[in-house]
Amino acid sequence: MIESQIVARVLPSKCREAVKVLLQEVYGYEDFRNLEVYDDLFRGKEKLQLSQGQLIEEVIMEAEKGIKGDSSAHNLLLTAPTGAGKSLLFQLPAIYLGNEYKLLTLVVSPLKALIVDQVEALRELGYERVAYASSDLSPEQKNEVYRRVREGEVDLFYLSPELLLAYDISYFVGERRIGLVVVDEAHTVTTWGKEFRVDYWFLGRHLEALKNALGYVFPVFALTATAVWNPEGGNDMIFDTIRSLHLAPCALYVGTVKRENIGFDITAMTIEEGETYDKAKQRTVAARVEDFLDGHKTIIYYPFAGGIDIKLKTWVYPANWHWVASYYGKKDKEQKAEIIQAFK
């Protein structure tokens, strides 16, 4: 069963007040923001404003059903644009579930840089019961993280799908009870899972087996900014994701993907007389890079990792080399960390 219609589900007043207090004390916000979502895509395309608070309450209520052994507990899938505050929608329930029930929330995410950014952002806010494990950590560091998780010092634990599928769950959590599993960047389950990172393709099956092995239920909350709704025209990433992650029964929230603060400026490249295409492209990129160096944060996508470091030297005058850097998967992890920090 896929439920798309927006239905108000309200926490008891005591719980609702606790959620509002966490919003203020941890994040420093007085009120929740609104998300623009479709009311019921099975019937039309009417949009409405959905408070982050309402969605957070639903996540908590589904987790509480799991605690009570209620088999009617739903999973959830949300599509919303980047910048809509999706991380708050699972972090705040995780903090609440940890405080109230000592439950652990697992966040499965494909991108190490995103994991580190979210964990560090929470720590900067003063919340310390969060940790992550990745290949960038030494074995000793990872073992210390697992110890903290097992001993109840961590309520929000980030890891990759490859790591989750590589070990028995007790290796990470010990006797801790899982209250919520979050799949961030959920579109990668289908877009990457078939060929690029195959563990994504088996993630849903693994989570189902995990529930059976543990003998209790917990909701899975999947979030993405880029899944496409197209049930009649093919290439429907939303239903592919629901099927792959075994999310049914699922409460589905489809938000608008258009961001009003993003524009596109497509300009045809000019090739001067006697100039080859490659020379014209190099000249154009070099000119644009010089423009961007005027105090603007800019990301330029290059199709190949190999050769990008040499290309940078041709695009930028030597006096400005310290303002630019290349970033790709095989770069040294210390260098990548320094680049991310400098870009911030």
Regions found by a protein language model. Give the residues of each.
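Conserved strand-helix element at the start of the C-terminal RecA-like helicase core
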Residues: 104-115, 288-318, 324-328
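Walker A/P-loop
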Residues: 69-93, 105-111
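Walker A/P-loop NTP-binding motif
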Residues: 64, 84-101, 121, 208-210
